[in-house]
């Protein structure tokens, strides 16, 4: 019945248009009964309540609204059956006319307070809404237009209701389409970003593949050229062996360098200072023998055994690596003899890199009576070289020649070095029952310019100066004419290098023969 009323509205519009032409008043619209619900609501209720149509339209779980699940099927099958048309938008606009609202914007669900499941009698409470802008449209018409003034009020209300329902449906559709468009735009942006990232990865992969192909071609060409060369394999193996050897030699050299650094704790003193040097007895004795035998470049004596019965103790080699402007002292400790025979006294000499061409001569012998004078005058000087049996002998003043200061320069040891004063030439370790003679060297010369240390000078109570009467007594004291061992120190300077494997008996026999020959030569020379 609702379509009929809707059609009657159209007829009213037509009558309104043609009324001025016929000059007849239109018939008033039929007013429905107040107790009967609108036919549109009754048909809609029957359609929703039909169980056979639940797949297309049905009640919601709350039973206070209905949902159109399949709008295309709804417009195709149900609308023509109940409402004689198939326009779904017209159905939505008609619902809006009766005050239905859309519950969920994402699906077609409509609700009304009087449209409840199982309560069909409430449909009477639902009435058609009157548009608020119906009277405004009438006021906007010109007052002189008699045709518009003669329009019935029912016609204006029906037109306003249709406009309101259409506006509501279109706005909902527009909002839904906008939301869908935004979702699609976001998805499109995300897909474009993924496409760009994929394109970049593909380009990088293509470049890497091209580089790999190029390197492979270069490698193949190189291998082809190398294989054609006949000596390629032999040269490659040789280079590999040489590199392995260099690595091994480098590691060995590093170990040797570390060992040398660990064995070289010496510290180079400043210029003009005196260095206390205590090398092995064998080294110092050989240096003293070279000085006493007037040899410019004397041959080295071979190292003997380190046993207490050997003639020379120690097996070291002289080390003199100092500058010419430095002065060093050599200290020799006494060698304890094991037999009753007098052994050859050992002495020390100082040699440097800048020795004078002419060396001084110094002869010594075993002293008998002179030992008392030495003990009295040099009570603070510790004996460095001594013998158990001292025999009296003769020693002239002309034979005692003190070495020059320049001859004391140049020896810097690699170990056991201390920067001290001139009095460091005396050893502080005295041996009981032993009397020795310390060759002082140029420290006694009047022209020596040496900085004395007060701390060390306190240890020497009275050191004899150059003009001291001690030296006159020492040089003029009578000694035994026994000259068998008179020049024993100088005799040993002409001995040829020996082999370390000699035993003690061979050493003594060879030394005795050399001493006898040397004594005869020296006696002839003195005559």
UniProtKB/Swiss-Prot annotation:
GO terms for biological process: cellular response to heat; regulation of transcription by RNA polymerase II. One of its GO terms (molecular function) is DNA-binding transcription factor activity. InterPro entries: HSF_DNA-bd, WH-like_DNA-bd_sf, WH_DNA-bd_sf. GO terms for cellular component: nucleus. Exhibits temperature-dependent phosphorylation. Residues 134-152 have a biased composition (Low complexity). Residues 39-133 bind DNA. The keyword Repeat does not apply. The keyword Transcription regulation applies. Gene3D superfamilies: Winged helix-like DNA-binding domain superfamily/Winged helix DNA-binding domain. Residues 317-326 have a biased composition (Polar residues). PROSITE patterns: HSF_DOMAIN. Disulfide bonds: none annotated. Residues 128-158, 241-273, 297-341 are annotated as: Disordered. Keywords: Activator, DNA-binding, Nucleus, Phosphoprotein, Stress response, Transcription, Transcription regulation. DNA-binding protein that specifically binds heat shock promoter elements (HSE) and activates transcription. Homotrimer. This is Heat shock factor protein HSF8.
